[in-house]
UniProtKB/Swiss-Prot annotation:
Protein name: Protoheme IX farnesyltransferase
GO terms of biological process kind: heme O biosynthetic process
Transmembrane residue ranges: 10-28, 38-56, 79-97, 108-126, 198-216, 229-247, 269-287
Membrane topology note: Multi-pass membrane protein
Periplasmic side: 29-37, 98-107, 217-228, 288-296
Catalytic activity entry: heme b + (2E,6E)-farnesyl diphosphate + H2O = Fe(II)-heme o + diphosphate
Other comments on record: Carbon 2 of the heme B porphyrin ring is defined according to the Fischer nomenclature.
Length: 296
């Protein structure tokens, strides 16, 4: 029973979602030549770092979690694990994860993990989430770290491919998070969390969602235009982006914002999973014959 509680406090659903993006970034950079020990070290290392961040987040948020329907049954809120024990647990997970990334992958992968961790725990959870409407924007940077870590674990350098991945996954986080804030509007309101839909209104949030999906669409295409992913990826990226944008635009006419937002959120998971899978299997070796070079 205790094992279940220690697992729950790490938010396994979030870990799993991040692993899909790590695999996408790693296999995109590997280009068919997979270093399996490096692959395992990277996956386990990122999993432990994400788990650590989630436990710290649970510790920090335990006061506001009590006020939200979605989070009122979390392990720390119910007192199933003491706050002191959770801090030790989170620290040990983090140390193990960072060591695996440093020694098993490379220092760059580790430092990217540190940056994502500091942004999520130190900047977002401790301050921005409670005090600023821009908390989601800052938090999106940490959410985009895993695929970049996976990519840089292979390359050992932060190149334009890594920058494109950072842009894709950061931009994806915004409509994804705003959709959650709309269908969980009352929860965020009750906990006094200043997310955009609560502070500026749902209609403003819909405008932001539309603009971020357009920016996301452009960023996804850059992987193919830059010669990192192939035409199959390009077709899937375009199809996913157009469909997601269509869903966003239909939001201006819906009668029930909550139902619409839940569907938009659900498709965001499908979209990012599809992109992660396609970049894993439809990679290209960058050379002068990229689509971008052909255009110019």
């Amino acid at each position: 029973m205790m094992f279940k509680q220690y697992l729950q406090v790490t938010k396994p659903g979030i870990i799993f979602g991040n692993l899909i993006s790590v695999i996408g970034g790693f296999l995109l950079a590997s280009k068919g030549s997979i270093d399996y020990p490096l692959f395992i070290y990277t996956l386990v290392g990122v999993s432990l770092v994400v788990a650590s961040g989630c436990v710290f987040n649970n510790y920090i948020d335990r006061d506001i979690d009590r006020k939200m329907e979605r989070t009122k049954n979390r392990v720390l809120v119910k007192g199933l694990i003491s706050p002191a024990v959770s801090l030790v647990y989170a620290t040990l997970l983090g140390i193990a994860g960072f060591m695996l990334l440093w020694f098993g992958a490379n220092p760059l992968a580790c430092w990217l993990g540190v940056m994502g961790f500091v942004v999520y725990v130190g900047v977002y959870s401790l301050y921005m989430k409670r005090h600023s409407v821009y908390g989601t924007l800052i938090g999106s940077l940490s959410g985009a770290a895993p695929p970049v870590i996976g990519y840089c674990a292979v390359t050992g350098e932060f190149d334009s491919g890594a920058a494109i991945l950072l842009a894709i996954f950061s931009l994806w986080q915004m409509p994804h998070s705003y959709a959650i804030a709309i269908f969980r509007f009352k929860d965020y309101q009750a906990a006094n969390i200043p997310v955009l839909p609560v502070v500026k209104g749902i209609s403003v949030a819909k405008n932001h969602i539309t603009l971020y999906i357009i920016a996301f669409a452009v960023a996804t295409l850059m992987l193919s235009l830059g010669g990192y992913a192939g035409y199959k990826y390009l077709v899937v990226a375009a199809a996913v982006s157009v469909w997601w944008l269509g869903m966003a635009l239909r939001g201006y006419k819906v009668a029930d914002d909550r139902i619409w937002a839940r569907k938009l959120f659900g498709f965001s998971i499908i979209a990012i999973t599809a992109l992660s899978v396609m970049m894993s299997v439809d990679f290209m070796v960058p050379d002068s014959h990229t689509l971008l070079a052909a255009v110019w």
